[in-house]
């Protein structure tokens, strides 16, 4: 007798219906896993991510919630455009094929998705809404256009994100990346910087690590801006510093290579230096070049040299700093390299420190009117002096910068803007949305095909009627993923205020910690921006955030150091060949330490795959792949199936209220496991859930079918219901086997009997002539005669009952048999 998982799983996948009721009065629960990019094939990371979310969704349905559990596709992006370029295929066709393949794969896992709410971000019906958002952002002052520095790939002729620049070269072309100034569109995320920072504290169910990462990314710092007069130029240099108290220790100023002042410097040596410096990273050796310019110290009669330095970033503050080498590590290294003065102005106990920078608290000295003050007081005093002189002020600075959303790519959402020579920047009228991508594009040359399109690019100006040109940049793909969770709330992929307010925020959001900053921060910003524009009233998109760990596997190499797939390694080992067994690492295509989920599902079934990725390891921790572990899960499923089927009949209308003795103990254990397992599900301790229902399975198997059939029936009914969120196909099949009514996923969650959870048992010592011979567990305050009988029976193999002279019993503590 064998469990036919293939037919069972296919049958129930076709039978389930998880649509959401529009008119339900139930309390809502919104469960969402981060939607995937349609690469065409799911991997084990996907499987683990989606299995975690599905357990929560199924459990919440069983607890009586109206569950929204949708799925969609983050469909725009570079891979589709690159595939089009490399294979001469339309990105839309390539993307749709991949979506179709992945949809089939996801359905084979048995995920309880609301498939009727499926969306794809590359559909005009989806992105027409974000084009309208953009127009509203313009109206509310949340979007603007300006010239800014970008990473430019001269071969692909496009802007690259910082993450796409590897060792100063384009990740795809290998060309040396240039810095260019281009007009770009931005969203004013900085308008919400303080609110984004402050409200992190309200996210009680977010991992602290994620909140810390966002806090650092926003990077609030308090200090001062100071205007330095540049000798020989009718200009001032504005800097921001968090350490204005160290101003008397300043020995130089430095600007970044992209600072506006640098653009006026024509010296060949300086231009060559800047060109070489741009390819180097911030963590390289601290280098710089003297500009030939000096600035006036605000309080001292001395000049400070102005340098261009590679550790000064335009992205922070004003792109300029004053250097105090005695109290900053970077400044110290720079000063040593270029022989600049090192002037200490803070010390612990009036002791000068010259050999290394001092970063601690202390007393000011060498600082005129600041001498003798502690640092905090010195900051206040010097800021007041700067304000009195009109050359500085107290300033709060954020590391966070406005979000540049322009991409010189075809496969993205068109930005709904028209450029007219007479009227300037003109928004596309709302009635003309969506601006749809043309399909007749060519990818034969580098750059953005939209920029060279013979017809799509040209359009009449909505204001004056003259010929104008469309904006050919497209939105950053993070734009689409920053609001998709709101689109799922409505059936037509739009933003409906009532349904958004009903279902949002997302109650459980599941995804990798690699999205801790950009995606999650942009989504938080979008909710604030859309709230400001009147779309809904939800500021925070995600109540509980679960960042699942990675799926890891041992790595293998052959004798020549070539990476091997696990199955290749097994074949070589079987042939006696030598291979190198490496460390356990995250599954990756490059190192070939991957396992195809489709192979596991085909060989063992979806429930085995689901059970394995949920067993042993807490969701937030990395898990190690184990073939033996998969086999063990498969054996458990078959064992449970046989155990239920071999009972032949199970009475789902059991009554065990009056059972006593050992059977009562079994029933208590079952209900305690149910209670603990339910608490584990509430707190997403899914590995503990698995451990408890495995224990429950073994417990039920111990019960004597002759004396405890009714209790077995109760245990089986509970067990089948509690495994359903994790192994839904098996559970549905067993529910039908025992004569269950309707579909199991629609049945309520079993409730543990509170009276059985009270631990009213005590351990009593059994003595013979005062010496301990056994211990027994009995109910608290058991009548003495019953206690004596149980105690006597427990040592019946040690005494001749006919020789018992008397029995002394102390309730709840000890029984002494005197012979």
Swiss-Prot record:
Q: What does the sequence similarity comment in the record state about its family?
A: Belongs to the class-I aminoacyl-tRNA synthetase family.
Motif: 'HIGH' region; annotated at 36-46
Predominant location category: cytoplasm
**Superkingdom classification of source:** Bacteria
Q: Which SUPFAM superfamilies match?
A: Anticodon-binding domain of a subclass of class I aminoacyl-tRNA synthetases, Nucleotidylyl transferase, ValRS/IleRS/LeuRS editing domain
Q: Which GO terms describe its molecular function?
A: aminoacyl-tRNA deacylase activity; ATP binding; leucine-tRNA ligase activity
Q: Which GO terms describe its cellular component?
A: cytosol
What would be the name of the gene that encodes this protein? leuS
In terms of InterPro entries, this protein maps to:
aa-tRNA-synth_I_CS, aa-tRNA-synth_Ia, Leu-tRNA-ligase, Leu_tRNA-synth_edit, M/V/L/I-tRNA-synth_anticd-bd, Methionyl/Leucyl_tRNA_Synth, Rossmann-like_a/b/a_fold, tRNAsynth_Ia_anticodon-bd
The record, for NCBIfam families, names: leuS_bact
Pfam families xref list: Anticodon_1 (PF08264), tRNA-synt_1 (PF00133), tRNA-synt_1_2 (PF13603), tRNA-synt_1g (PF09334)
Q: Which residues bind ATP?
A: 589
Q: Which GO terms describe its biological process?
A: leucyl-tRNA aminoacylation
Q: Which UniProt keywords apply?
A: Aminoacyl-tRNA synthetase, ATP-binding, Cytoplasm, Ligase, Nucleotide-binding, Protein biosynthesis
Known EC number: 6.1.1.4
Name under which the protein is recorded? Leucine--tRNA ligase
Ranges spanned by the short sequence motif 'KMSKS' region, renumbered to the chain:
586-590
Which reaction(s) does the protein catalyse, per the Swiss-Prot or TrEMBL entry? tRNA(Leu) + L-leucine + ATP = L-leucyl-tRNA(Leu) + AMP + diphosphate
């Amino acid at each position: 007798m064998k469990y036919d998982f293939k037919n069972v799983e296919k049958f129930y996948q076709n039978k389930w219906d998880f649509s959401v009721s529009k008119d339900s009065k139930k309390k809502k629960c919104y469960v969402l896993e981060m939607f995937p990019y349609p690469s065409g094939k799911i991997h084990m990371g996907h499987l683990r991510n989606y299995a975690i979310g599905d357990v929560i969704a199924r459990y919440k349905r069983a607890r009586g919630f109206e569950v929204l559990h949708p799925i969609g596709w983050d469909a725009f992006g570079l891979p589709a455009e690159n595939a089009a370029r490399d294979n001469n295929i339309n990105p839309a066709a390539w993307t749709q094929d991949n979506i179709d393949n992945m949809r089939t794969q996801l359905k084979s896992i048995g995920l309880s998705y609301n498939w009727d709410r499926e969306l794809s971000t590359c559909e005009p019906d989806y992105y027409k809404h974000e084009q309208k958002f953009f127009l509203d952002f313009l109206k509310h002052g949340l979007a603007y256009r300006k010239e800014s520095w970008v990473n430019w790939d001269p071969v692909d002729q496009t802007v690259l994100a910082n993450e796409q620049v590897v060792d100063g070269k384009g990740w795809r072309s290998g060309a040396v990346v240039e810095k260019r100034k281009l007009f770009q569109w931005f969203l004013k995320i900085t308008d919400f910087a303080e609110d984004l920072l402050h409200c992190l504290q309200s996210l009680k169910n977010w991992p602290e690590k994620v909140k810390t990462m966002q806090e650092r990314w926003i990077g609030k710092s308090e200090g001062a801006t100071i205007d330095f007069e540049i000798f020989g130029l009718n200009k001032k240099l504005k800097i921001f510093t968090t350490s204005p108290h160290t101003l008397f220790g300043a020995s130089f100023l430095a600007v970044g290579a992209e600072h506006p002042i640098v653009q006026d410097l024509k010296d060949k040596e300086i231009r060559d230096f800047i060109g070489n410096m741009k390819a180097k990273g911030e963590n390289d050796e601290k280098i710089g070049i003297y500009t030939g310019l000096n600035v006036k110290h605000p309080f001292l009669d001395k000049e400070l040299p102005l340098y261009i330095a590679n550790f000064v970033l335009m992205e922070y503050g004003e792109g300029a700093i004053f250097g105090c080498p005695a109290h900053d590590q970077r400044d110290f290294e720079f000063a040593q390299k270029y022989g600049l003065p090192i002037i200490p102005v803070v010390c612990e106990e009036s002791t000068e420190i010259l050999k290394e920078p001092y970063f601690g608290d202390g007393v000011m000295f060498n600082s005129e009117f600041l001498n003798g003050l502690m640092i905090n007081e010195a900051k206040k005093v010097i800021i007041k002096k700067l304000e009195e002189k009109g050359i500085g002020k107290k300033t709060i600075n954020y590391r966070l910068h406005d979000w540049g959303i322009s991409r010189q790519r075809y496969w993205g959402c068109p930005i709904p803007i028209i450029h007219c020579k007479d009227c300037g920047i003109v928004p596309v009228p709302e009635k003309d949305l969506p601006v749809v991508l043309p399909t007749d594009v060519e990818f034969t040359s580098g750059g953005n095909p939209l920029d060279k399109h013979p017809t799509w690019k040209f359009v009449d100006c909505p204001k004056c009627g003259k010929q104008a040109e469309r904006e050919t940049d497209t939105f950053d793909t993070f734009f689409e993923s920053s609001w998709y969770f709101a689109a799922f709330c409505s059936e037509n992929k739009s933003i409906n205020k009532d349904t958004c307010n009903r279902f949002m925020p997302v109650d459980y959001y599941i995804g990798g910690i690699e999205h801790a900053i950009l995606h999650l921060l942009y989504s938080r910003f979008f909710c604030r921006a859309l709230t400001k524009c009147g779309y809904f009233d939800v500021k925070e998109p995600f109540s509980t955030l679960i960042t699942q760990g990675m799926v890891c596997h041992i790595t293998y190499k052959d004798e020549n150091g070539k990476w091997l797939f696990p199955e290749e390694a097994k074949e070589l080992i079987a042939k006696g060949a030598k291979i190198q067994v490496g460390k356990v690492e995250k599954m990756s295509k490059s190192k070939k330490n991957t396992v195809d989920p489709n192979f596991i599902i085909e060989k063992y079934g979806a429930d085995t795959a689901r059970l394995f990725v949920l067993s042993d390891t807490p969701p937030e921790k990395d898990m190690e792949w184990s073939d033996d572990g998969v086999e063990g899960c498969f054996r458990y499923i078959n064992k449970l199936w046989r155990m239920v089927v071999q009972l032949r009949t199970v009475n789902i209308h059991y009554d065990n209220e009056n059972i006593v003795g050992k059977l009562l103990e079994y029933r208590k254990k079952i209900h305690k496991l149910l209670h603990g397992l339910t608490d584990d599900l509430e707190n997403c301790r899914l590995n503990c859930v698995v451990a408890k229902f495995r224990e429950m399975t073994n417990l039920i198997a111990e019960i004597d079918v002759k004396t405890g059939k009714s209790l077995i029936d109760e245990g089986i009914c509970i067990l089948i219901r509690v495994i359903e969120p994790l192994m839904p196909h098996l559970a549905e099949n067993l529910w039908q086997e025992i004569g269950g009514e309707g579909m199991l996923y629609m049945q309520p969650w079993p409730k543990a009997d509170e009276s059985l959870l009270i631990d009213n048992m005590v351990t009593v010592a059994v003595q013979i002539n005062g010496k301990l011979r056994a211990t027994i567990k009995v109910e608290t305050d058991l009548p003495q005669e019953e206690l004596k009988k149980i105690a006597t029976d427990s040592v019946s193999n040690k005494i001749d009952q006919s020789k018992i002279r008397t029995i002394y019993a102390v309730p709840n503590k000890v029984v002494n048999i005197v012979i």
